[in-house]
Amino acid sequence: MFRQRTRVLFLISAMLAIGLPVHSATPASGTLSGIANPVNWSGGPYTAVATDTSSCTTLNCDTFFLNINTSAGFFTTNSNDEVQIRITWQGVTNEFDLYLFDPSGNLLASSVQSFETFEEIDAGPLPNGTYKLVIVASQTVNVSYSGTAQIAADPTVANGKARYQPGKMTFGTPFELPRPNDPANTVTTLVFDQDVEPRVVHDSLGNLYVAAIQGVPGGVDVWKSYDSGKSFTYLGQPDGTQVLATTGLTTGTGLGGGDEDLAVGTSGNVYMNSLWLGSTTQASSFNGGSTWIVNPLSSDIPADDRQWIASYGNNTLYLTYKQLGTLLNGTVSIVVVKSTDGGITFPQITQVTTPVSGVQPGDQGNIVVDPRNGNVYTVFFDQTSTQVYIARSTDGGVTFDLKLVYQGPADTSLAHVFPAIAADEGSNLHIVFSDGVNTYLTTSQDLGATWSHVVRVNNGASTRTAIQPWVVAGDSGKVDITWLGSSSTNFLDSSAQWQVFMAQSQNGLASVPTFAQSTVTGVIHVGPVCVNGLGCPSGTRTLAEYWAPDVYLDGNALIVYPDDKNSGLASGAARTWFVRQTAGPTIILTVQ
């Protein structure tokens, strides 16, 4: 597909050089007054390239004026009806984008996607007035489009539709989390100079904790904020405690740092787990990170990968990981172990996937515990990376049942990179994942028994590609979804410019959810982002594979992410940066 796009761009450039006629929508306007009167128009043919509405000329954009003129109280009487707008064209290598502006000229909604032959806006019940539709020929060769606007019933069952609006969330100035320049924590090689795959969590007092990996055996760096994220104090490497006796260093270098995860208990216990070559190291602090008790063999079984932890109550901690074949003679399986003493020991061991279950796991996402009922959930792909599964336990992790959440196309990989799951305050579940082009959301309102139709989350010319998604849940049906986005349609594009994005949904359980999207950062990386783990070519995996945000006590988003563009390291390594939401809607309406 990328080679096809390159040929298309070459052809567009050649045709633009000889000059093209100006086109306009036919007709130029239309009126919707009721359900039985759809409006149709068309435009083109276009051979053009355009970024978005800011680059519009008469050669690459079309304008259609839509008049809404319904009777008084029409949408009150017809409460399930909405304005639906759709454009279609031929050929997935062509791209048109669709923008809707209100009578005052403000961007109201848009539909911008890639590798499709349509754009669609579900605009909701619009007040009477004249609205402007802008159709952008973002990448087209001698192709026309057809448009339709109608008033029709809102779907009562989720069918993949969503509404996309500009976000009103604003964010502060991002800053890097520094670490001391001492021999214990700064090594001159790329592997150890980095701090990637960060996670941020908070406790009930408002303290923030951040952890990020240097890479095996560089260890895990941990920071704490006492002032709601205005500043951070470096706490050292909790997994370094296990080698203090042999190194004689005051802070201690880590033995792990392959992967990490971070969690807090209800009374403030802090848990950090670090992957090393033999097992995982569980570091637990019962005094706010001042000191740590360390178990370097917390997985109980050797040969592990990509571990995750989740706390429940004050002293219960679940640890899950992908076991690489020790148990089943080379067969990969998912294991969950449980501690009831704050991570000091893990006596309960449960094998989640077995050959009998008929599911061979691929990449595994995070583990969560619903604090309202104690149910335990983890999410994973199958070995082909075309299926999404959850594993659910309703008996404290003793047994798990598996449920297929989503079956993707046979020729599409969903491993870009980990799926992520969250439980909201209503015990609803939310899963996000990426197919390398878009980030998708699916939800469950019955404890994981059934799942909604997947819906695209990212929207807009600046994020035609969306990878490395994560989801954080708040009140019932309310979620923040973050991802790494680029205007390029190929995540291996050597010139792609990547930014952090966040979409918020206040009605994630609706048949047509609404996503309000904001850009969180400037450019944090230029070039390809490989998602093939250790199989990636050199220099394409500097951002590693994930970053996990949080939502604070006041409902504002807390976001940590890797950045190799603004850190300024001579090695080109990425460091961990932090940014906090400063204004706008939140997913927790009742401040804790």
Task: Walk through the language-model features, giving the residues of each.
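Sec/Tat signal peptide C-region and signal peptidase I cleavage site
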Residues: L20-S24
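Short beta-strand/loop motifs in extracellular/secreted proteins, especially
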Residues: D81-V83, N94-L98, V141-Y145, V220
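Noncatalytic accessory or regulatory domains flanking protease catalytic cores in secreted, cell-surface
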Residues: Y99-T148
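C-terminal PAP-associated
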Residues: L32-N80, Q90, A152-Q592
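Bacterial N-terminal signal peptides
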Residues: F10-G19
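Short solvent-exposed strand-capping/beta-turn motif centered on an Asx-Ser/Thr pair
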Residues: T88-V92, S138-T140
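Bacterial N-terminal signal peptides that target proteins for export
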Residues: M1-F10
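Cleaved targeting-peptide boundary
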Residues: A25-T31
